[in-house]
Every structure is written in structure tokens, then in C-alpha cells.
């Protein structure tokens, strides 16, 4: 949903519509507004570029994976999340989840590598990289 929400934010419409309408409606709206003929995949890739660029700017400001966290009660054993049934007392395996998320986004420890920007067609220009030699994970 992040990529779809990035698109809805750029449309300046309520992102909760994505739950009711889905990507198909966004494609119709986009094509109607612009006169273009983009596909669902192209629109989601646009959202991926938006979200990745937002993360890249956060990286430039000094933020990385160490800043992606949750309140202690979700990840520390003494104050497990209250709940009912199967969720009662469960803890979030945050580090594992973060690494899986970063792999899906093709980031390295929360940092957008230059190769990812290039793959998305984002040209930032010379001398602005934040990847510190980080390379995109190899495709499995």
C-alpha cells in the first residue's frame, strides 16, 4: 500500500480511498487527468519512485535503519503488547522485519543505494550520494 499511498498523496486526495477503490480507480483517474495511458504497474512504479526518493532525502538528513523503531513495549520482553487471544503478549521481531522490508525495497540497512535510484530512473546528480559504498542486495 505504500506505493499506492504515495500516488494518492501526489493526487492530493484522501488516501483512505485506496482501501475502497484500489489501484484500478487510480489508473482511471490519472489517465483521465493527464490524457496519458499508464498501466497499474507503471503507476505503482511511480509510487515506488516517490517513496524511495522520500527515503533518500531522509538518508541525506542523516536517518537510516537505526532510526526505524517502535516503542519499547512492542520489542522488549518485559512489556509485551497487551492483547487478546493469539496476539496477547506477543513481541515484534523488528530487526528481522526491517531487514525483510529493506530487501523488498532494495535498500541496505535503511539506506537507498545509488543502484536503486538508477534502477528507478532517478538521477540525483554527482556528489549527493549517501550510500557510503552500500550496494543493492543481489536478486535471488
Please place each PLM-identified region on the residue numbering.
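Extended C-terminal regions of large enzymes
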Residues: 1-140
Amino acid at each position: 500500500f505504500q506505493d499506492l499511498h504515495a500516488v494518492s498523496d501526489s493526487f492530493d486526495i484522501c488516501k483512505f480511498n485506496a482501501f475502497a477503490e484500489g489501484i484500478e480507480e487510480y489508473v482511471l483517474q490519472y489517465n483521465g487527468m493527464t490524457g496519458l495511458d499508464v498501466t497499474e504497474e507503471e503507476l505503482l512504479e511511480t509510487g515506488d519512485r516517490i517513496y524511495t526518493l522520500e527515503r533518500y532525502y531522509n538518508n541525506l538528513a542523516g536517518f537510516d535503519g537505526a532510526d526505524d523503531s517502535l516503542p519499547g513495549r512492542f520489542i522488549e520482553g518485559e512489556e509485551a503488547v497487551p492483547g487478546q487471544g493469539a496476539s496477547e503478549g506477543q513481541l515484534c521481531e523488528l530487526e528481522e522485519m526491517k531487514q525483510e522490508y529493506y530487501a523488498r525495497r532494495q535498500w541496505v540497512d535503511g539506506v537507498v543505494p545509488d543502484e536503486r535510484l538508477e534502477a528507478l530512473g532517478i538521477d540525483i546528480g554527482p556528489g549527493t550520494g549517501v550510500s557510503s559504498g552500500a550496494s543493492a542486495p543481489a536478486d535471488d
